[in-house]
């Protein structure tokens, strides 16, 4: 009896599958038919997400913020927008109520990464290695504030040294800059590397917490949009690709588990190496399409008409807001030598 019942059920499911395959119309393009929900908070609150070991991620203050908490105090990578700085401070204190903010690292100078610099730095206090009256000490060591670290060009743009009035208060400026390939710290019992990785500007940094194996990358990876390439600040699509290749060199997958090196992007969800590889391939494909159009003598309008980003627009594209798909295509086109 069991066999006689099972056979009709199998036939029924097979028939249903045949009917479905005959009636369903598969989309010709794009490859992404869905837009995954990203855990970026839009509720006006700052949310704390534990990442690994000493490292946590703050979401909801503009760009993502990274916090290392331990015996030396707190190191904060990027500070969100000015409007959210009080809530960012409260979130940091929830991680370590007695922890002192010792360092702030800016991955670039964009307002949603540096807007909270002043308030967060003034709430901290850098560890002093020399007396405050020593003329060699930085501003942060002479004052009761956390030191702000960045690549030197970030300070140059934030301080407006060409004679223009800076829109950033002086206490928000980086006071501990570097101009070499990297700056090394030993903080909270682990090596921390601040590395110069030009991408969307000429002054981007990424921060590698080596023992916890977490990398905070700022604008190098944005899981909510195409890269914000700032041509005036020395950014280019080729630099973004070079930066992503550099990131892939220092990330390691764990074949036995789901993770390995974890990556905190400038916006969007927490990533692993496979996510970065996908993002790199996407940028490479789009770059090649635009470059091919330039080689064939196409204008910017003609390249836009061919929609070189179409496959990825459901996930990363925007038609409104401060950074649209058209703006990204134009920035990539100009950075590749298009006229």
Per-segment meaning from a language model:
Residues 1-6:
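Positively charged n-region of N-terminal signal peptides that target proteins for export
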Residues 48, 71-75, 83-136, 146:
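Active-site metal-binding motif and surrounding structural segment of the metallo-beta-lactamase
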């Amino acid at each position: 009896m069991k066999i006689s019942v099972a056979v009709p059920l199998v036939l029924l499911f097979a028939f249903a599958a045949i009917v479905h395959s005959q009636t369903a119309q598969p989309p010709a393009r794009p490859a992404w038919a869905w837009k995954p929900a990203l855990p970026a908070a839009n509720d006006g609150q700052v949310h704390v997400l534990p990442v690994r070991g000493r490292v946590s991620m703050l979401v909801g203050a503009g760009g993502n913020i990274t916090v290392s908490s331990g015996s030396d105090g707190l190191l904060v990578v990027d500070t969100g927008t000015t409007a959210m700085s009080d809530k960012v401070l409260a979130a940091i204190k929830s991680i370590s109520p007695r922890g002192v903010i010792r360092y702030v690292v800016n991955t670039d100078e964009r307002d949603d990464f540096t807007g909270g610099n002043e308030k967060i730095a003034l709430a901290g206090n850098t560890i002093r290695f020399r007396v405050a009256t020593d003329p060699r000490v930085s501003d942060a060591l002479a004052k009761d504030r956390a030191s702000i670290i960045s690549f030197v060009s970030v300070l140059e743009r934030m301080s407006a040294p060409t004679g223009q009035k800076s829109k950033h208060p002086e206490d928000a400026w980086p006071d501990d800059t570097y101009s070499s390939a990297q700056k090394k710290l030993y903080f909270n019992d682990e090596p921390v590397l601040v590395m110069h990785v030009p991408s969307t500007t000429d002054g981007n940094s990424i921060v590698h917490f080596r023992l916890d194996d977490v990398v905070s990358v700022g604008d190098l990876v944005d899981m909510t949009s195409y890269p914000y390439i700032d041509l005036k600040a020395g950014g280019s699509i080729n630099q973004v690709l070079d930066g992503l290749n550099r990131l892939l060199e220092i990330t390691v997958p764990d074949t036995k588990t789901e993770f390995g090196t974890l990556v905190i992007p400038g916006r969007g969800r927490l990533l692993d190496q496979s996510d970065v590889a996908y993002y790199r391939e996407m940028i490479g494909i789009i770059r090649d399409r635009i470059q091919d159009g330039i080689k064939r003598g196409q204008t910017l309008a003609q390249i836009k008409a061919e929609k070189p980003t179409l496959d990825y627009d459901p996930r990363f594209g925007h038609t409104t807001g401060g950074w649209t798909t058209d703006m990204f295509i134009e920035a990539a086109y100009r950075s590749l030598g298009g006229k």
